[in-house]
A protein has these predicted regions:
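Membrane-interface alpha-helices at helix entry/exit sites of multi-pass transporters
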Residues: 76-81, 112-123, 151-162
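Membrane-embedded alpha-helical segments and adjacent helix-loop junctions characteristic
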Residues: 33-116
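Generic alpha-helical transmembrane segments of integral inner-membrane proteins
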Residues: 19, 46, 84, 88, ...
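Alpha-helical transmembrane segments and, especially, the helix-loop junctions at the ends
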Residues: 90-100, 117-149, 171-175
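Juxtamembrane and boundary regions of transmembrane helices in multi-pass small-molecule transporters
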Residues: 2-4, 154-202
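Transmembrane helical segments that form the transport core of multi-pass membrane transport proteins
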Residues: 36, 65, 207-231
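Residue-level signature of transmembrane alpha-helical entry/exit and packing/kink sites
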Residues: 10, 14, 40-42, 75-83, ...
Length: 231
């Protein structure tokens, strides 16, 4: 009984949402639910997730992180590099994936220089959300809105570009508030290397196909089938 109470307390929001969903079923015919499933959207999301997972498994993001961080010679430039790496990558690989891919590296880097990573991680979180808002495939919400609204590419980017520009400025200001201190990083003999580089061009081609399917240049079923065959 105690475990049940603890579960209800921890998952209160999920339980309430489930109950409300069940109640809503009374007012909507069951036959309508099938029409809610957007198979094209699910197919595109699967394609992006599978391809990004391929990049991740082959250490692409680790190598990118190390190369970007190596350019920084002080704490401020390190923050700029890490924050804007997440900002721009989230436009392509979605906000949550960008955070999962790069925050562990940020924590590791700040442990090496004996500094707290909290402020930079907060900026990275903001960067991931604001950067992902720029493209139709930056996050699932954008993907759905772009698909459902039938907007043209120019209409979509005319809405997101001003927000993205302001976000970049605010993130830059946030990074500039960090005190500039020199950092000295020992060369790591066990640098990350890209695994199976021969597959990277294939993954890149699939990623481009996924993007083209968002803009209805390529059929979603063809992309889904291609990803399934390769991955």
């Amino acid at each position: 009984m105690t475990d049940l109470k603890q579960f209800i307390k921890q998952e209160a929001v999920a339980i309430i949402a489930f109950i409300v969903a069940i109640i809503s079923c009374i007012f909507v015919p069951v036959t309508n639910y099938v029409s809610y499933i957007d198979t094209d959207l699910i197919g595109v999301m699967f394609g992006f997730m599978a391809v990004v997972a391929g990049f991740s498994v082959n250490n692409v993001f680790k190598v990118l992180s190390e190369q970007v961080a190596a350019l920084a010679k002080d704490t401020r430039n390190l923050a700029l590099a890490l924050v804007f790496m997440v900002f721009f990558m989230s436009m392509l690989i979605t906000n949550d994936v960008a955070l999962i891919a790069f925050i562990p590296f940020t924590v590791m880097m700040y442990e090496k220089i004996d500094k707290s990573p909290v402020y930079v991680i907060v900026l990275q979180t903001i960067a991931a959300n604001m950067g992902s808002a720029f493209t139709p495939f930056g996050n699932p919400q954008n993907l759905y809105l772009f698909s459902a609204s039938k907007m043209t590419s120019s209409e979509f980017f005319s809405l997101t570009l001003p927000v993205t520009a302001v976000s970049m400025l605010m993130l830059f200001i946030g990074c500039m508030m960090i005190k500039k201190e020199p950092i000295f990083l020992e060369k790591d003999e066990q640098k990350a290397t890209v695994q199976n580089p021969k597959y990277l061009l294939l993954y890149a081609a699939l990623f481009i196909l996924c993007i083209l399917s968002v803009f209805n240049v390529v059929d979603t079923i063809s992309v889904f089938a291609s990803v399934c065959v390769v991955v």
